[in-house]
Protein backbone atom coordinates (compact mmCIF):
# COMPACT_ATOMS: atom_id res chain seq x y z
CA UNK A 1 0.00 0.00 0.00
CA UNK A 2 1.29 3.44 -0.88
CA UNK A 3 2.23 5.38 2.27
CA UNK A 4 -0.02 8.22 1.16
CA UNK A 5 -3.02 5.99 0.55
CA UNK A 6 -5.56 6.12 3.35
CA UNK A 7 -6.78 2.70 4.50
CA UNK A 8 -10.32 2.06 3.30
CA UNK A 9 -12.91 2.06 6.05
CA UNK A 10 -14.79 -1.19 6.50
CA UNK A 11 -18.56 -1.34 7.07
CA UNK A 12 -19.62 -1.86 10.67
CA UNK A 13 -23.22 -2.25 9.52
CA UNK A 14 -24.72 -3.29 6.18
CA UNK A 15 -28.30 -3.25 4.96
CA UNK A 16 -29.31 -5.07 1.79
CA UNK A 17 -32.58 -5.02 -0.13
CA UNK A 18 -34.60 -3.33 2.61
CA UNK A 19 -38.32 -3.10 1.92
CA UNK A 20 -40.62 -1.38 4.41
CA UNK A 21 -44.32 -1.04 3.83
CA UNK A 22 -47.30 -0.17 5.98
CA UNK A 23 -50.49 -1.67 4.63
CA UNK A 24 -50.41 -1.02 0.90
CA UNK A 25 -48.03 1.93 1.21
CA UNK A 26 -44.43 1.08 0.38
CA UNK A 27 -41.92 3.42 2.02
CA UNK A 28 -38.61 1.79 1.05
CA UNK A 29 -38.07 -0.24 -2.11
CA UNK A 30 -34.99 -2.50 -1.93
CA UNK A 31 -32.71 -0.05 -0.15
CA UNK A 32 -29.07 -1.03 0.39
CA UNK A 33 -26.65 0.91 2.58
CA UNK A 34 -23.27 0.47 4.26
CA UNK A 35 -22.35 2.37 7.43
CA UNK A 36 -18.57 2.65 7.60
CA UNK A 37 -16.57 2.12 10.77
CA UNK A 38 -15.89 5.41 12.55
CA UNK A 39 -17.89 7.68 10.26
CA UNK A 40 -20.71 10.12 10.93
CA UNK A 41 -23.46 9.33 8.43
CA UNK A 42 -26.43 11.64 8.03
CA UNK A 43 -29.83 10.43 6.78
CA UNK A 44 -32.17 13.01 5.26
CA UNK A 45 -35.35 13.03 3.22
CA UNK A 46 -38.74 14.64 2.89
CA UNK A 47 -41.76 14.10 5.11
CA UNK A 48 -43.06 10.55 4.72
CA UNK A 49 -39.79 9.26 3.24
CA UNK A 50 -39.33 6.91 6.19
CA UNK A 51 -36.20 8.34 7.79
CA UNK A 52 -37.04 7.25 11.33
CA UNK A 53 -38.32 3.87 10.09
CA UNK A 54 -35.00 3.30 8.35
CA UNK A 55 -33.11 4.28 11.50
CA UNK A 56 -35.13 1.80 13.57
CA UNK A 57 -34.58 -0.87 10.92
CA UNK A 58 -30.80 -0.33 10.99
CA UNK A 59 -30.80 -0.40 14.80
CA UNK A 60 -32.75 -3.66 14.89
CA UNK A 61 -35.83 -2.06 16.42
CA UNK A 62 -38.04 -2.65 13.38
CA UNK A 63 -38.10 -5.77 11.22
CA UNK A 64 -38.44 -4.93 7.51
CA UNK A 65 -40.85 -6.70 5.17
CA UNK A 66 -37.86 -7.86 3.13
CA UNK A 67 -34.09 -7.55 3.22
CA UNK A 68 -31.50 -7.95 5.95
CA UNK A 69 -29.31 -5.89 8.28
CA UNK A 70 -25.93 -7.17 9.49
CA UNK A 71 -23.88 -5.71 12.35
CA UNK A 72 -20.24 -6.78 12.39
CA UNK A 73 -21.14 -9.42 9.83
CA UNK A 74 -23.92 -10.99 11.93
CA UNK A 75 -27.60 -10.72 11.08
CA UNK A 76 -28.93 -8.24 13.59
CA UNK A 77 -31.92 -10.37 14.59
CA UNK A 78 -29.56 -13.19 15.64
CA UNK A 79 -27.68 -10.96 18.09
CA UNK A 80 -28.92 -11.41 21.66
CA UNK A 81 -30.68 -8.53 23.40
CA UNK A 82 -27.87 -7.91 25.91
CA UNK A 83 -25.13 -8.04 23.27
CA UNK A 84 -27.08 -5.75 20.98
CA UNK A 85 -27.56 -3.26 23.82
CA UNK A 86 -23.79 -3.23 24.39
CA UNK A 87 -23.09 -2.58 20.70
CA UNK A 88 -25.84 -0.09 19.88
CA UNK A 89 -26.88 3.15 21.56
CA UNK A 90 -30.06 4.97 20.50
CA UNK A 91 -31.19 8.53 21.12
CA UNK A 92 -34.85 9.04 20.30
CA UNK A 93 -36.24 12.33 19.00
CA UNK A 94 -37.71 13.56 22.29
CA UNK A 95 -35.01 12.03 24.48
CA UNK A 96 -37.42 9.38 25.84
CA UNK A 97 -36.26 9.82 29.43
CA UNK A 98 -38.45 8.37 32.16
CA UNK A 99 -40.02 11.32 33.98
CA UNK A 100 -40.32 9.40 37.27
CA UNK A 101 -36.57 8.69 37.39
CA UNK A 102 -33.77 11.11 38.12
CA UNK A 103 -31.27 11.87 35.37
CA UNK A 104 -28.69 9.56 36.95
CA UNK A 105 -31.27 6.78 37.33
CA UNK A 106 -32.14 7.14 33.65
CA UNK A 107 -28.47 6.79 32.72
CA UNK A 108 -28.07 3.76 35.00
CA UNK A 109 -31.12 1.97 33.60
CA UNK A 110 -29.27 0.11 30.79
CA UNK A 111 -26.65 -0.98 33.33
CA UNK A 112 -29.34 -2.35 35.64
CA UNK A 113 -30.97 -4.24 32.79
CA UNK A 114 -27.90 -5.68 31.08
CA UNK A 115 -25.04 -5.90 33.62
CA UNK A 116 -24.42 -7.21 37.11
CA UNK A 117 -22.53 -4.10 38.21
CA UNK A 118 -22.82 -3.10 41.85
CA UNK A 119 -24.92 0.03 42.59
CA UNK A 120 -21.79 2.02 43.50
CA UNK A 121 -20.18 1.16 40.17
CA UNK A 122 -23.33 2.13 38.27
CA UNK A 123 -23.43 5.49 40.05
CA UNK A 124 -19.77 6.13 39.28
CA UNK A 125 -20.19 5.25 35.60
CA UNK A 126 -23.36 7.36 35.33
CA UNK A 127 -21.45 10.38 36.65
CA UNK A 128 -18.72 9.75 34.06
CA UNK A 129 -21.24 9.48 31.22
CA UNK A 130 -22.95 12.70 32.28
CA UNK A 131 -19.60 14.46 32.25
CA UNK A 132 -18.84 12.96 28.84
CA UNK A 133 -22.13 14.40 27.58
CA UNK A 134 -21.17 17.84 28.86
CA UNK A 135 -23.16 17.82 32.11
CA UNK A 136 -22.00 18.19 35.69
CA UNK A 137 -22.31 15.11 37.88
CA UNK A 138 -24.63 16.95 40.30
CA UNK A 139 -27.18 17.23 37.47
CA UNK A 140 -27.84 13.55 38.09
CA UNK A 141 -30.12 14.23 41.05
CA UNK A 142 -32.48 16.35 38.95
CA UNK A 143 -35.53 15.05 37.12
CA UNK A 144 -36.08 15.47 33.36
CA UNK A 145 -38.80 18.07 33.95
CA UNK A 146 -36.20 20.31 35.59
CA UNK A 147 -33.93 20.35 32.55
CA UNK A 148 -33.87 22.56 29.47
CA UNK A 149 -34.41 20.98 26.06
CA UNK A 150 -30.68 20.93 25.39
CA UNK A 151 -29.93 19.31 28.74
CA UNK A 152 -32.58 16.63 28.12
CA UNK A 153 -30.79 15.80 24.86
CA UNK A 154 -27.44 15.60 26.67
CA UNK A 155 -28.90 13.37 29.37
CA UNK A 156 -30.27 11.10 26.65
CA UNK A 157 -26.79 11.03 25.11
CA UNK A 158 -25.36 9.98 28.47
CA UNK A 159 -27.86 7.12 28.69
CA UNK A 160 -27.15 6.04 25.11
CA UNK A 161 -23.44 5.88 26.03
CA UNK A 162 -24.02 3.90 29.24
CA UNK A 163 -22.83 0.55 27.86
CA UNK A 164 -19.99 1.94 25.69
CA UNK A 165 -21.66 1.23 22.33
CA UNK A 166 -19.74 0.99 19.09
CA UNK A 167 -22.46 2.69 17.06
CA UNK A 168 -24.90 5.47 17.98
CA UNK A 169 -28.24 6.04 16.24
CA UNK A 170 -29.58 9.56 16.71
CA UNK A 171 -33.11 10.57 15.68
CA UNK A 172 -33.32 14.35 15.14
CA UNK A 173 -30.81 15.23 17.91
CA UNK A 174 -31.10 18.99 17.30
CA UNK A 175 -34.88 19.23 16.81
CA UNK A 176 -36.69 21.91 18.83
CA UNK A 177 -33.39 23.48 19.91
CA UNK A 178 -32.27 27.05 19.36
CA UNK A 179 -29.29 27.47 16.97
CA UNK A 180 -26.72 27.96 19.75
CA UNK A 181 -27.85 24.87 21.67
CA UNK A 182 -28.03 22.86 18.44
CA UNK A 183 -24.47 23.89 17.63
CA UNK A 184 -23.41 22.58 21.04
CA UNK A 185 -25.05 19.21 20.30
CA UNK A 186 -23.26 19.06 16.93
CA UNK A 187 -19.96 19.72 18.71
CA UNK A 188 -20.74 16.96 21.22
CA UNK A 189 -21.44 14.46 18.42
CA UNK A 190 -18.20 15.34 16.66
CA UNK A 191 -16.22 15.08 19.92
CA UNK A 192 -17.67 11.66 20.75
CA UNK A 193 -16.87 10.46 17.24
CA UNK A 194 -13.31 11.80 17.22
CA UNK A 195 -12.29 11.01 20.80
CA UNK A 196 -14.01 7.63 21.23
CA UNK A 197 -14.15 6.43 17.63
CA UNK A 198 -17.89 5.83 17.88
CA UNK A 199 -19.71 5.37 14.58
CA UNK A 200 -22.71 7.71 14.39
CA UNK A 201 -25.85 7.54 12.24
CA UNK A 202 -28.01 10.68 12.39
CA UNK A 203 -31.50 11.21 11.05
CA UNK A 204 -31.93 14.95 10.70
CA UNK A 205 -33.55 17.70 8.67
CA UNK A 206 -31.00 20.16 10.09
CA UNK A 207 -28.88 21.19 7.11
CA UNK A 208 -26.19 22.67 9.34
CA UNK A 209 -25.74 19.31 11.07
CA UNK A 210 -25.61 17.50 7.73
CA UNK A 211 -23.18 19.94 6.15
CA UNK A 212 -20.78 20.46 9.05
CA UNK A 213 -20.29 17.13 10.83
CA UNK A 214 -21.40 14.33 8.47
CA UNK A 215 -18.72 12.59 6.43
CA UNK A 216 -21.38 11.17 4.10
CA UNK A 217 -25.08 11.79 3.60
CA UNK A 218 -27.80 9.31 2.62
CA UNK A 219 -30.89 10.93 1.09
CA UNK A 220 -34.23 9.15 0.82
CA UNK A 221 -36.34 10.13 -2.18
CA UNK A 222 -38.86 8.19 -4.28
CA UNK A 223 -38.50 5.11 -2.01
CA UNK A 224 -34.80 4.86 -2.94
CA UNK A 225 -31.60 6.01 -1.27
CA UNK A 226 -28.69 8.02 -2.68
CA UNK A 227 -25.46 8.06 -0.66
CA UNK A 228 -22.34 10.16 -1.03
CA UNK A 229 -20.30 13.07 0.20
CA UNK A 230 -21.93 16.48 0.18
CA UNK A 231 -19.80 17.54 -2.79
CA UNK A 232 -20.96 14.50 -4.77
CA UNK A 233 -24.63 14.91 -3.84
CA UNK A 234 -24.54 18.60 -4.78
CA UNK A 235 -24.03 17.41 -8.37
CA UNK A 236 -27.13 15.19 -8.33
CA UNK A 237 -29.88 15.89 -10.85
CA UNK A 238 -32.56 14.11 -8.82
CA UNK A 239 -35.20 16.85 -8.37
CA UNK A 240 -35.81 16.52 -4.62
CA UNK A 241 -32.11 16.20 -3.78
CA UNK A 242 -31.24 19.19 -5.94
CA UNK A 243 -33.94 21.37 -4.37
CA UNK A 244 -32.96 20.22 -0.86
CA UNK A 245 -29.25 20.95 -1.27
CA UNK A 246 -29.52 24.11 -3.36
CA UNK A 247 -32.51 25.80 -1.72
CA UNK A 248 -32.42 29.06 0.27
CA UNK A 249 -31.94 27.29 3.62
CA UNK A 250 -28.86 25.52 2.29
CA UNK A 251 -26.95 28.78 1.84
CA UNK A 252 -26.57 29.39 5.57
CA UNK A 253 -25.56 25.77 6.14
CA UNK A 254 -22.89 26.01 3.44
CA UNK A 255 -21.51 29.13 5.11
CA UNK A 256 -21.42 27.30 8.45
CA UNK A 257 -19.62 24.39 6.74
CA UNK A 258 -16.92 26.67 5.34
CA UNK A 259 -16.41 28.25 8.76
CA UNK A 260 -16.34 24.85 10.48
CA UNK A 261 -13.83 23.39 8.04
CA UNK A 262 -11.76 26.53 8.22
CA UNK A 263 -11.57 26.21 12.01
CA UNK A 264 -11.03 22.45 11.89
Residue locations for each model-derived region?
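Conserved ABC ATPase "signature" region
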Residues: 120-138
